[in-house]
Every structure is written in C-alpha cells, then in structure tokens.
Amino acid sequence: MKTILILRHGKSDWEADYGADHERPLATRGQKGARKMGRFLTTARAVPDRALTSSAVRARETLATAAEAGGWTGPARITDALYEASPQAVLREIQAETDDADTLVVV
C-alpha cells in the first residue's frame, strides 16, 4: 500500500429516527457530498483499491455512495474498531491491512 486517503463521513441526519449514535444515517447533504467526493477522487486518479470503514451507518453509507459514484470496485473491510477510535487504534487498523493495495481509503 502506497497511498492512504482519509475520508470523513458525510453530514449525518440528526433529525432521522435512529436508536443509538452508531445508527445515525447520512443526511441528503451528506449523500451529495459523498457522491461528489467519489467522482472527484476518480477524476483525480486517486481510486482506492481497498477500503476500510467504521461500522457506523453514516460511515458505511459514505463509502457505499462514494464508491458507486466513483466506480470503485475494490474490497472493503467494515470494522467496529474504527467507531470512536483513537488515532492509535486507527493506525493499528490501517497496519492490519494487506500490502497488495496501492491506495487505501479509510472512512
């Protein structure tokens, strides 16, 4: 792996009906931003080969929306370890990824 892209989840919907913070979905604005970022990264030739994302609904939705808009087809690993993770925990998760990818996106 040579490049790591850090992508923050899109704007979440505080008005949605959700139980716990972990279940909060993207707002329409967040979906639009994720699509825009997916297309941007593809246009910039920064298409991720692999993805690593938090199990939070808004993070998974951000990744799925960006990937669809950008035409990304690489595998994704969803992990609870990234939800509310410390910088050290994020680094451990990145280090656990395989080296066969040139570009990894972390959401």
Regions found by a protein language model. Give the residues of each.
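Generic beta-sheet signal
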Residues: 4, 97-106
